Regions:
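Non-catalytic cap/lid and distal C-terminal segments of serine-dependent acyl enzymes
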Residues: 1-182
Length: 182
């Protein structure tokens, strides 16, 4: 079952696609929450970049997963996805790989703060969530941001999944942060 919320982040309206387990409205259970990035790619091909989605809801339904998913749509303006998903502007490694010094990035910390301080409380108020069972997952730059958020908020996110993470954008910084996080 899918619902859509609209939130405001960085002075822009953004969709958050919510997946609820099939039995959500017929039970009184509480559920863990998985926060994801690039929400337009999570559930359906209609709005997915390139017309291909993860079809996550089909897999969750098939395996009867007791999980709420909150998938935040990306900012599609210019390089804003890079700006929002990269905690730091750039690193030496990204310059080496890209062949130029990128000025993109640097809003990832604010984006992670938004999820923890605004979106998570909204989800906790609106849905029957399970206290202390919050996860985050992302692909590419979303993987970088997920690892960053897990390091910044280890008491909030119990599990992190970074798939094909684009660490190269902030390689040195994320290694240093991950190495200093208990």
């Amino acid at each position: 079952m899918l619902e859509v919320l609209t939130v405001s982040i960085f002075n822009q309206e953004r969709k958050v696609r919510i997946y609820l387990p099939e039995d959500y409205y017929s039970s009184h259970k509480r559920y863990p929450v998985l926060y994801m990035h690039d929400g337009q790619n999570a559930f359906g091909a209609e709005e997915a970049i390139g017309g291909v989605s993860l079809d996550l809801h089909k897999h969750l339904d098939q395996f009867k997963s007791d999980l709420i998913v909150a998938a935040i749509d990306q900012n599609t303006e210019g390089e804003e996805r890079i700006n929002e998903y990269c905690p730091w502007k750039h690193g030496d490694f990204s310059e080496l790989l890209l062949g130029y010094k990128s000025g993109s990035g640097g809003k990832g910390s604010d984006y992670a703060d938004f999820i923890v301080n605004e979106l998570k409380p909204l989800i906790d108020r609106k849905y029957r969530t399970m206290s202390g069972e919050n996860y985050m997952a992302g692909i590419s730059l979303g993987g970088l941001l997920s690892v960053y958020a897990g390091c910044k908020y280890p008491d909030v996110f119990k599990r992190i999944a970074g798939m094909s993470s684009a660490f190269y954008r902030n390689q040195e910084e994320i290694e240093k942060l991950a190495g200093s996080t208990p």
